[in-house]
Amino acid sequence: MHVIRETLKGGKGEVIKNPKVFIDPLSVFKEIPFREDILRDAAIAIRYFVKNEVKFSNLFLGLTGTGKTFVSKYIFNEIEEVKKEDEEYKDVKQAYVNCREVGGTPQAVLSSLAGKLTGFSVPKHGINLGEYIDKIKNGTRNIRAIIYLDEVDTLVKRRGGDIVLYQLLRSDANISVIMISNDINVRDYMEPRVLSSLGPSVIFKPYDAEQLKFILSKYAEYGLIKGTYDDEILSYIAAISAKEHGDARKAVNLLFRAAQLASGGGIIRKEHVDKAIVDYEQERLIEAVKALPFHYKLALRSLIESEDVMSAHKMYTDLCNKFKQKPLSYRRFSDIISELDMFGIVKIRIINRGRAGGVKKYALVEDKEKVLRALNETFEDSISIGDFDDVGEN
């Protein structure tokens, strides 16, 4: 009982000084290290757009945790501040959309953009793509709009996604676009007419161990109590994260989790970091599953029962019927499986059995137990474990 009281009060042995540093770093950090050149070039392009009506389109490319989203949101916030100081920026309107989080379809992305730019709710269904574009044009008339499309690869890999980009980039409205993608090959999915409208790609190189250590030292300085960590701990976390393509997001998450585990003990030790690594990998998979759109979850649940994609589609169709959802075609279902493979949740295998057996597509779910638990937690209000077990038995 007394332990709970001490924890609630944050007394003896506390490690974390300001958790907001880890949860909302943009509210604390006024500079972004190792990305100064990218920020300067982006600022110049934005200034030309606002003051000289020279439109731009940038594609931010880099692996997870290399600062693409952080830089984009930092730019967004800085523009909002400049609007208070410079009259020429007064009519600049911005819209940030994570394509995957809104569903990834052209309709969902355009609906979200139109809503943010017009200030009105725009339906995701029942409107053709041209009408969405018209709403966006009307919402940006006599102003300058900067659109941020995060995880844009989710959009361009969908049917019609290229049309959205082409319409936005070639629109006669005053719109400039910053696109963000973890998939460094995303341009391969774009049609030539879209590529011809794109500006140069901006590559975010992975952070090395020394850069990660510097970043961690800043988070520790602002977020942790002095004396609760040492240089060796920061170096250890930086070295681990540098091995995984220089992922700063992972490094910061590990430091925060290790600090939470050390709470009450007064100092972060190596065993706290090792435990944080295990927790991080589990949470990353679970959160990825929970963030999936509804039909992706049904597809994933079907794959747990059958690795054969054709058979899994039949089970998926049964699930859709059971829960009064219109099933997607096998082609679209197969596309979803490919996206799940891209997310690292499943691994696809193509087996050619010769002329007699043909080609069969299989998808192995990574860590079935954790994925199943995440699905059950997600569906606990609408779909029980028993509901899944009944599918296919009729």
From Swiss-Prot:
Family note: Belongs to the CDC6/cdc18 family.
Tagged with keyword Magnesium: no
Organism from which the protein derives: Saccharolobus solfataricus (strain ATCC 35092 / DSM 1617 / JCM 11322 / P2) (Sulfolobus solfataricus)
Keyword annotations: ATP-binding, DNA replication, DNA-binding, Nucleotide-binding
Signal peptide, first to last residue: none
Pfam families per UniProt: AAA_22, Cdc6_C, Cdc6_lid
Protein name as annotated: ORC1-type DNA replication protein 3
Induction info: (Microbial infection) At least 4-fold induced following infection by Sulfolobus turreted icosahedral virus 1 (STIV-1) in strain 2-2-12.
Further remarks about this protein from its record: Strain 2-2-12 is a substrain of P2 that is highly susceptible to infection by Sulfolobus turreted icosahedral virus 1 (STIV-1).
Binding site for ATP: 66-70, 207
Oligomeric form and interacting partners: Monomer. Interacts with Cdc6-1, Cdc6-2, MCM and PolB1.
Role of this protein: Involved in regulation of DNA replication. May play essential roles in origin recognition and cell cycle control of replication. Binds to DNA, with a preference for molecules that contain a bubble, a fork, or a tail. Inhibits the binding of the MCM helicase to the origin DNA and inhibits its DNA helicase activity. Also regulates the DNA polymerase and the nuclease activities of PolB1. Inhibits the DNA-binding activity of Cdc6-1 and Cdc6-2.
SUPFAM superfamilies: P-loop containing nucleoside triphosphate hydrolases (SSF52540), Winged helix' DNA-binding domain (SSF46785)
Alphabetized GO MF terms: ATP binding; ATP hydrolysis activity; DNA binding
GO BP annotations, alphabetical order: DNA replication
